Amino acid sequence: MLLILRLFTLVASPADLGPDESQYWFWSRDLAFGYFSKPPMIAWTIGATTALFGNSEWAVRLAAPLLHIGAAVFLYLTAKQLFTQRIAFWAGVAWLTIPGVTLSSFLITTDALLLFFWSGALFFLLRIIQAPSPKLLDFAALGAAIGFGLLSKYAMIYFPIAMVLAMVMAPPVRRTVLRPELLLTASIAVGLLIPNILWNVANDFQTVAHTAANANWGASLFKPGNLLTFIVEQFAIAGPVFFGVFLWVGYRQWRGFSKVTSDKTTINALIPFALTPLVIVCVQAFISRAHANWAVAAYPAIIMLAVAWLHEHRAAWVAKATVGAHAALTLAFVLALSHFSTVDRLGLASAIKEIRGWEEQSHAVAAMAAGYDAVMIDDRALMGAMLYYERGTPLEIVAIDPNASISHHYEAFKAFDPDKHKRVLFVTTRSDDNHVNYRFKQITPLGPTTVSLGGDQMRTYHLFDVAEFFGKRQR
């Protein structure tokens, strides 16, 4: 029922594609082994769903709720191995209703892919740990899950790190997992990643460099306020009850990890898969910054541990009540995404501004583009929106680099070409011509184009007629 509700909402929602989503869609038009800011799996996935169902917004996003259902199935199967069928059922349901997954089910992001493959890898690893005689197929499947996870988001690298920690801290896990068959796991994972590595080599390590730049270690460092913000955000992603219970469980179990008995080894083995992403990203948040979703890989283990602890301590009703509260929140999301007017009346228009107004804004700019060789844009968000919403037109849409360095995919692969684009309609977030006045001799302001995003939220771009390029050519 939850899947049907989410699919219906995707189809019925007036939400436009957001900046990242439209960029991923653009990537899917030209399938490759890598892209500027992400590995290729997101583009391959969108390419598959749009090939089957067309290019509507819901078709672009279709994989998101399906992937989370798949992750829930893996969590159910994993929890069933470790605990009871009842705990497994509630772990799967809890997963589908936590706020972070609810939001992620309505948008196409790399997180949905990462969580699916992470949950699959966790399932196959626990099968290996628990089996008296592990099967070669499970080692192969583990390698495939890790490899495909790395092709989805490089944060999958936390998984092998957590594996090593589990083997170091729990000798029974080490004896079960550290076998010759593990070479097959590593070979498959690395083999799947090699095409992406080669793509990075051929393209100046763009994805790797972008990922490193996101860490922002070149700015002022050591920001405890950012760490506190990140921790508070984790309570919002999993819900305060489940995340709070996990912190208590993690504290208790981690203290006694070395004394764990053999029948509890597999349960304790989950903890590194929760703490590894959390601790690494907490350090990153303290040093510089971290987005709320950067530790999202921790949550499959977090939810299983929290639900199991509540059931085993006669507090199953707390888990069920929390799921009920999260389900109510899901219904609120459905209402908000189906009826933007409700959001506006509540004064929350700013919360959804990233998925509103792009189609209208794109068409407004396109209406001004007659007679120009191209529309030239200095903003990644509008660039993606116009490529998506003007896809059925012959309009040429190109990016111009405003800061003498390649900042996103369009600047690298959809750049302004002065040999082809003699007279262009320049669209900018700035009200002045500072991004072009040292490159073009002829510049005529044409005024702004503004769209309403609900409430008092507005989005404005400024248009200029520019020609006679004389500046430095982009790479």
For the regions a language model picked out, list residue spans one by one.
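Transmembrane-helix motifs of polytopic, lipid-linked glycan transferases
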Residues: 62-83, 120, 124
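Membrane-interface transmembrane helices that cradle and orient dolichyl/undecaprenyl
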Residues: 80-86, 121-138
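Hydrophobic/aromatic-rich transmembrane helices and adjacent perimembrane loops
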Residues: 31, 104, 237-240, 244, ...
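Membrane-proximal, lumen/periplasm-facing interface regions of secretory-pathway glyco-
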Residues: 292, 316-371, 380-410, 426-474
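Transmembrane-lumen/periplasm boundary regions of multi-pass, lipid-linked membrane glycan transferases
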Residues: 148, 160-267, 273-277, 282-285
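Short acidic/glycine- and proline-prone juxtamembrane loop motifs at membrane-interface regions
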Residues: 100-114
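Transmembrane-helix signature of polytopic, membrane-embedded enzymes
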Residues: 75-97, 116
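Short helix- or helix-capping micro-motifs
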Residues: 2, 91-99, 146, 150
